[in-house]
Amino acid sequence: MLEEEKMKKIEIKRFTVDDIYVSVLKAKLVKHEGGWMRFEEVRKTFEPTGSVLMDALGQVLLEDKGIIAKDFAKAVGAKSWVMSWAFQWLTGMTLYEFLNQYRLKLACEWLTCTDLNIKEIARRSGYTSQSKLTNMFAKRFGCTPREYRKANRPANYAQLYEWE
């Protein structure tokens, strides 16, 4: 039997945007088992992932939602192609794709939980323009940010969430 055949396959956990995502909200209205409700603060940090690279990206995204793959690679002292390979291995997607998913998640939360205008949401989510956000939304969700908001934001959103 070949050595390779004896070796048991090791499953590697793939990292997702959720592993380093930090909510845009300050607080959410939470209903407790006893029926009473109160606002609870939303955590503004992420739990360490165990990956130096993912944790570094999480820290960078807390400060700069608009960072691009090339600049992140430079910041951690890696060549862009090495970073691309590492992210492909860690997440199953390129760093560019990962950053876009992160930004779309931010935008979705802004859209469903606030009354901010689309241009401001694009800016806060790290997009260079409202049209860039709209294009990414169309590709990912098949709708505009405005349509997404209309379909997903609860009527009483202002009573459910606190944001800055």
Stretches found by the model and what they are:
Residues L29-G35, K44-E47, V60, S80-S84, ...:
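Short amphipathic alpha-helical segments, especially helix-boundary/capping motifs
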Residues P48-V52, A78, Y102:
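A generic alpha-helix signature
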Residues E3, K9-G35, F39, R43-F46, ...:
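…primarily DNA-binding HTH/wHTH and HhH modules…
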Residues R38-E41, T45, T49-I68, F87, ...:
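Basic, amphipathic alpha-helical hairpins
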Residues W89-S125, N152-E164:
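Terminal helix-turn-helix DNA-binding modules in bacterial transcription factors
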Residues W36-M37, K70-L99, R124-E147:
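Basic/polar phosphate-binding segments, predominantly the helix-turn-helix DNA-binding elements
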